[in-house]
Amino acid sequence: MISLTQNEIIKILLKKKMLLIVMLLLIFVSLLSYGQKYSYDNNIKKFEAESGGVAYDWKALTTQRLDDLEERSNNEFIPKEVRASIDREIQQLNYFIENDINPITPTASKFNVQFVEQGITLFIPLLIVILAADLVSNEFSKKTIKILLTRAVPRWKILLSKYIALIIMTTILVFIIAVLATLVSYLFFQQWGFSEPIVTGFNLVEGELNSNSTILISRFQYTLLIYSLLWFVSIVIASITLMISVLVDNSSSAIGILMAALIGGQFLQFFLSEWKLVKYFFVTNLDLTRYLTGSYQPIEGMSLNFSILTLSAWAVLSLVISFTVFNRKDVLV
């Protein structure tokens, strides 16, 4: 099994897709870091110009942001779920001001978390799809599966070795994302920020903000928590991608199907949020990070435990289908 897994890892590396993914990550992280730094510098210049040359003060900007949020929260026409999400941000900003913690100045730790929060539902899953979509389908399209199955090795072992290799490469990819996001953003911001405290554990109960379970942790701990959730989501996406790769003999079709599912799922949760079955679709459960911040939930009845169980069910079902179909698939065609 070890030699089979090593062989599959070498196959993935020889395709040079990991190099392509790293290059894409480097470009996106650099652009986003530069954009955030540029926006921050512009805000400082704007503040100093409007205040008649008064030096930049993060507390003044935070207070201004706080006033804007309180004005929005007092709007009687917004949904109570949205108001609860705004109230959560108000509580956090008040805590930062009272404890002299700067929440505005960008740091590597803040960028790290923001990058995962924004990319966990589409961008990062697409990278996993690029990595894994042709894992099995390419063997069938190039007819190399016949050579692979001539060995005295059971089919399930061959597929298991591919899956183990995929898990290893997915784990490496998540690690690369963390390293690139940290180092590149630090080059722009010149601050790590991992020792800063952050309040987390907010949740929505029947549209109302519940802060009874909030805890104070460092940004380093919070970053580890965020990346743990990202790793779990990535493994689920990898499992589903493996299933599609087994079911479809063409790698381009596999990528197309998965891209359509990821993009289409984003539309489903906003335009068909009242349809009860939508919350069981894997795409609507990918954003696990929103449960840590108490963000607005577009679909009622969803929680962190619900999403983890739903995604786990999708992963297990995908593996069952993958092994069942692969063991019975006709390779003579």
Residue ranges and their predicted role:
Residues 128-132, 145, 180, 240, ...:
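Hydrophobic/aromatic residues in alpha-helical transmembrane segments
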Residues 6-15, 240-247, 312-333:
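Junction motif at the cytosolic side of a transmembrane helix
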Residues 34-38, 251-281:
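Transmembrane helix segments
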Residues 1-25, 160-162:
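Aromatic- and glycine-rich beta-strand/loop motifs that create alpha-glucan
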Residues 39-98:
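Membrane-proximal extracellular/periplasmic loop immediately following the first transmembrane helix
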Residues 276-294:
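Short hydrophobic, aromatic-rich alpha-helical segments embedded in or entering the lipid bilayer
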Residues 141-159:
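Interfacial "coupling" helices/loops that link adjacent transmembrane helices in transporter permeases
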Residues 28, 32-50, 58, 95-138, ...:
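Secretory targeting signals
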